[in-house]
């Protein structure tokens, strides 16, 4: 019966922790398609940053990825001039023959940077290279291909993939830390409320028995018989 109650409580605790995880994830992280801007509660837009639970190195690397994606798709002036115009990649696609290859090389630099800083898994890199291939096929169309490549915004899509991956991984890491802290607190609380050791009770009982034995009166043996001489000279058996 105690095993059934224990398993039931563990199941309820696991469901509760999963609900808490989902609630924490919904409040602190949401996937995005726009890696450049986010909107505050008051409706104002500002530059998108990684969530607060990410490390400083992750945040610094994200700024570099963000600036490179902006340079490729949105602005010729680079990160110092955040004006939504046109980036280098669509212009390179206008060059005959070599243009699409140069555009592919530009977009691939973003993947190399992200992989070097975040150690991306294989499935994420395959997805990002797939976006570059689509952009390359679109840019093969003369003139209009450059327009389609600009609208497709390959580096923007790949930067959003990087943001979502890094944010989700950091969220799982933060949640694991919270779970570990909770388990440690439960261990300490259980140790403080643990029942006395059974062996100690045995020793106490043993001491009580010993005290009873010490309180008993000592057992005295009867005196040994001895032979004494009577007054008439005959030996007489008796006790001294």
UniProtKB/Swiss-Prot annotation:
GO CC annotation: cell periphery; membrane
Species classification: Eukaryota, Fungi, Dikarya, Ascomycota, Saccharomycotina
List other remarks: Present with 1520 molecules/cell in log phase SD medium.
Q: Which organism encodes this protein?
A: Saccharomyces cerevisiae (strain ATCC 204508 / S288c) (Baker's yeast)
TM ranges:
86-106, 132-152
Protein name as catalogued: Uncharacterized membrane protein YLR326W
What are the UniProt keywords, alphabetically?
Membrane, Transmembrane, Transmembrane helix
Topology of the protein relative to the lipid bilayer: Multi-pass membrane protein
- Which residues lie within the region annotated Disordered? 181-240
Q: Where is the composition biased (Low complexity)?
A: 197-210
Gene induction: During S phase of the cell cycle.
* Segments in the Extracellular topological domain: 107-131
Which residues lie toward the Cytoplasmic compartment? 1-85, 153-240
